[in-house]
Structures are given as structure tokens and as C-alpha cells.
């Protein structure tokens, strides 16, 4: 190459036999995708109705709150962990008396 710019005459291509281990992969192989009907349908997750009884979250309130939920086994366990952890439910009377940031 002479000069700062490359010209077509300066490019020399050497074509040699390609080694078998570096052959390109044929992306259009004989593989076929299954039809939607052939794919397995996900089984319906079993949901069970639960009645949850939890105390009001205010310190001086004796009210027991009843909540009815329809949940999976995993969902009801997660809800149980929330209720025994950081989440506290309030009764309607205590909701008006407690200070809260939400509406």
C-alpha cells in the first residue's frame, strides 16, 4: 500500500481451503419447531380459598380482622410471611386514627 488511503488494487484476497473445524454452521438445518397444539399446555395452578384472621396492627386495639383470599399454596405462604413480618393490617376505626403517609 502506498499512500494514506486504501484502494481496491491494494487489497489481495487469498482464498484457501477451509478447515473442517471452522466450517460455518448451517442455521437452516432440518430442525422444525413444534406447533402450538403440540406444545404441552401448562397445568392450571390450583388455587384454594382461605379465611385469614389477623389482629389489627394498632397497639391498643383488640379487633380481629377477617380476610378471604383465593391463593396458591406459595401465595398463601408468602402472605403469611408478610403478616408475621413487616405488614400490619388496620381495622377501619384505627385507619382514621393512625398517622400514615398513603391515602
Curated annotation (Swiss-Prot):
GO cellular-component term (any): host cell nucleus
GO biological process terms on file: DNA-templated transcription; symbiont-mediated perturbation of host cell cycle G1/S transition checkpoint; symbiont-mediated suppression of host innate immune response; symbiont-mediated suppression of host type I interferon-mediated signaling pathway
Modification comment: Highly phosphorylated.
Gene3D superfamilies named among the record's database cross-references: 3.30.160.330
GO MF: DNA binding; DNA-binding transcription factor activity; protein domain specific binding; zinc ion binding
Region of interest called E7 terminal domain, as start-end residue ranges on this chain: 1-47
Keyword Membrane found: no
Zinc finger unnamed: from-to: 56-94
InterPro entries: Papilloma_E7
Function summary: Plays a role in viral genome replication by driving entry of quiescent cells into the cell cycle. Stimulation of progression from G1 to S phase allows the virus to efficiently use the cellular DNA replicating machinery to achieve viral genome replication. E7 protein has both transforming and trans-activating activities. Induces the disassembly of the E2F1 transcription factor from RB1, with subsequent transcriptional activation of E2F1-regulated S-phase genes. Interferes with host histone deacetylation mediated by HDAC1 and HDAC2, leading to transcription activation.
Subunit structure: Homodimer. Homooligomer. Interacts with host RB1; this interaction induces dissociation of RB1-E2F1 complex thereby disrupting RB1 activity. Interacts with host EP300; this interaction represses EP300 transcriptional activity. Interacts with protein E2; this interaction inhibits E7 oncogenic activity. Interacts with host TMEM173/STING; this interaction impairs the ability of TMEM173/STING to sense cytosolic DNA and promote the production of type I interferon (IFN-alpha and IFN-beta).
Entry similarity comment: Belongs to the papillomaviridae E7 protein family.
Domain notes: The E7 terminal domain is an intrinsically disordered domain, whose flexibility and conformational transitions confer target adaptability to the oncoprotein. It allows adaptation to a variety of protein targets and exposes the PEST degradation sequence that regulates its turnover in the cell.
The name this protein goes by in its record: Protein E7
Gene (UniProt): E7
Amino acid at each position: 500500500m502506498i499512500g494514506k488511503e486504501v484502494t481496491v488494487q491494494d487489497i489481495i484476497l487469498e482464498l484457501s481451503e477451509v478447515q473442517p473445524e471452522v466450517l460455518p454452521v448451517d442455521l437452516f438445518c432440518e430442525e422444525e419447531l413444534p406447533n402450538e397444539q403440540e406444545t404441552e399446555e401448562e397445568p392450571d395452578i390450583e388455587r384454594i380459598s382461605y379465611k385469614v384472621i389477623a389482629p389489627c396492627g394498632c397497639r391498643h386495639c383488640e379487633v380481629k380482622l377477617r380476610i378471604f383470599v383465593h391463593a396458591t399454596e406459595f401465595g398463601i405462604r408468602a402472605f403469611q410471611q408478610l403478616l408475621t413480618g413487616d405488614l400490619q393490617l388496620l381495622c377501619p376505626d384505627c385507619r382514621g386514627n393512625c398517622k400514615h403517609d398513603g391515602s
